């Protein structure tokens, strides 16, 4: 028997807390499952959202475990498991939106890799410590999967002649999207929006072709983009607008900057029309009415939809490959010990994080 500690909650009225139980590592898994000893787990806004929307009347009384992104070591493997063995270094995104009886901010994570497809093997980079490897690889599954899905889910076959606009170039998703777009899909033009102070970094270090500020008091970001399409792209519109931060200011100009339905243009959002205030989340406010109208309005002449990350192995394998090649480096904002989980949550709620917030579980 071993101690198994997790950061858990019951519903939105109960605070996060560390709960402990004992599990028998020889009996706690099925033939189709593996047991991962978690070394690091990363927090994502969806973790806070799920806690905040766990209303007592619908979420039940069972404890729910915080977290999705993880990295660790396989310590047990069922006899029917294929592709994973004891000692493997693995990372992934654990998906259980409904019950959340298992999560990544815990000592052990039991999963069926034939169902939980967002899992991959990883290798330490040359000169990298064990801790650094676990921290880095806990920090990218969800955001990299989101970026990959934005670029591929509509099967636009984006390439050298394509043009992509990223709203939120400084976000972790925006960074990953740029790296996939340039290094794997070889997309010709990737433009982003960010603060004036981040333009130089996002262009010279990250690699965006052009950036416009969202905090220019003389002209909105949407007006900047409209002028850029007209003057620099000579009227050639974007194939894809990927909203990684929550914005609605581009819709008045949408027909001037993005290709229409008939030309397979797509506006994809992972947030909705506005940036969430994760300290004050209510169910009705979380439902994006304007977004629903845009999505289901039969009279609009552009494609608009929300993007959700599927459980899939392709983006996990791609992310691991790009890290090994040096074409993608996950951004890590800060690292906290397991007992400092509340400080990690506060950092996420601050909206000031520049990269992933990681909790060291071991």
UniProtKB/Swiss-Prot annotation:
One of its GO terms (cellular component) is mitochondrion. Its main location: other. GO terms for biological process: DNA damage response. This is Protein YIM1. SMART domains: PKS_ER. It comes from the Eukaryota. It comes from Vanderwaltozyma polyspora (strain ATCC 22028 / DSM 70294 / BCRC 21397 / CBS 2163 / NBRC 10782 / NRRL Y-8283 / UCD 57-17) (Kluyveromyces polysporus). Belongs to the YIM1 family. It holds the Pfam family ADH_zinc_N_2. CDD domains: AST1_like (cd08247). One of its GO terms (molecular function) is alcohol dehydrogenase [NAD(P)+] activity. Keywords: Lipid droplet, Mitochondrion. It is found in: Lipid droplet; Mitochondrion. InterPro entries: ADH-like_N, GroES-like_sf, NAD(P)-bd_dom_sf, PKS_ER, YIM1/Zinc_Alcohol_DH_Fams.
């Amino acid at each position: 028997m071993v101690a198994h500690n997790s950061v858990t909650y019951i519903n939105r009225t109960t605070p996060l807390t560390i709960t402990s139980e004992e599990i028998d590592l020889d009996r706690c898994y099925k033939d189709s499952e593996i047991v991962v000893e978690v070394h690091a787990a990363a927090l994502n806004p969806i973790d806070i959202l799920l806690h905040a929307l766990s209303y007592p009347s619908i979420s039940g009384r069972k404890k729910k475990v915080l977290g999705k992104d993880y990295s660790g070591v396989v310590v047990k493997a069922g006899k029917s498991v294929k592709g994973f063995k004891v000692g493997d270094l693995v990372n992934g995104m654990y998906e259980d939106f409904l019950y959340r009886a298992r999560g990544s901010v815990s000592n052990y994570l039991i999963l069926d890799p034939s169902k939980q497809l967002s899992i991959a093997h990883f290798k330490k980079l040359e000169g990298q410590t064990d801790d650094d490897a676990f921290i880095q690889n806990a920090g990218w599954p969800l955001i990299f999967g989101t970026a990959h899905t934005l670029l591929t889910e509509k099967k636009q076959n984006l390439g050298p002649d394509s043009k992509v606009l990223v709203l939120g170039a400084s976000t972790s998703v925006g960074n990953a999207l740029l790296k996939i777009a340039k290094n794997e899909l070889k997309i010709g033009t990737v433009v982003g929006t960010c603060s004036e102070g981040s333009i130089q970094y996002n262009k010279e270090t990250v690699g965006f072709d052009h950036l416009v500020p969202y905090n220019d008091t003389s002209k909105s970001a949407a007006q900047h983009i409209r002028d850029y399409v007209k003057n620099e792209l000579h009227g050639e519109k974007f194939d894809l607008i990927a909203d990684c931060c929550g914005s609605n200011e581009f819709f008045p100009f949408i027909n001037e900057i993005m290709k229409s339905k008939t030309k397979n243009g797509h506006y994809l959002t992972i947030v909705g029309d506005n940036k969430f205030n994760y300290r004050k989340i209510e169910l009705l406010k979380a439902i994006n009415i304007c977004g629903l109208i845009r999505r289901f309005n039969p009279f609009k002449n552009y494609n608009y939809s929300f993007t959700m990350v599927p459980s899939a192995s392709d983006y996990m394998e791609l992310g691991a490959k790009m890290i090994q090649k040096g074409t993608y480096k996950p951004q890590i904002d800060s690292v906290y010990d397991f007992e400092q989980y509340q400080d990690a949550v506060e950092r996420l709620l601050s909206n000031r994080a520049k990269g992933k917030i990681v909790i060291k579980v071991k």
